[in-house]
Amino acid sequence: MGPDSTPAEILTETCTIAMIGASPDPAKPSYGVMEYLMAQGYKVIPVRPGEGEILGMPIVNSLAGIDEPIHMVDVFRRSEAAPDIAREAVAAGAISLWLQPGCVSDEARGIATSAGLAFAQDICTKQVHRDQSVGPIGPSLLP
């Protein structure tokens, strides 16, 4: 996976997702996407301020607080936050950065792709997964 990967390829090569802006509110889009991705076999780690759990997964306050490989950083935040999140994703060793609908940043794209990360923006992980019939086949799922 690299800067030229398609959204479907990113999802296929992803197992662990750090979801920035995950919400414990079932009415929020991030909650529904997290629930869907977990049901499809992805491990989704909610990243947000505070403590507790979302869908049984403990909340982590930053990417730096995750002590396992991060395949994708999935972002439910405003576009203005994307460049700093891209820098954090690079520093955390993430393989891809995905900005959800409404989040668009050429600066974040440049930061991510120049560091070799795959990148998608202004598109929903749940929608791509459903439309492309892809699923995780990353390293943790291979024999």
Region spans (language model):
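NAD(P)-binding Rossmann-fold cofactor-contacting core
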Residues: S23-K28, M34-I54
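Conserved beta-strand elements of the Class I
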Residues: I17-A18
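A charged, well-structured terminal subsegment
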Residues: V128-P143
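Active-site regions of enzymes building and remodeling cell-envelope glycoconjugates
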Residues: G56-L63, A118
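A short helix->loop->beta-strand "cap" motif at the edges of active sites that frequently abuts
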Residues: Q40-Y42, A92-S96, A115-L117
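Rossmann-fold NAD(P)-binding glycine/threonine-rich loop
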Residues: P101-V128
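Mid-chain, well-packed structural core segment of small domains
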Residues: L63-V104
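Short N-terminal or domain-adjacent regulatory/targeting segments
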Residues: M1-T14
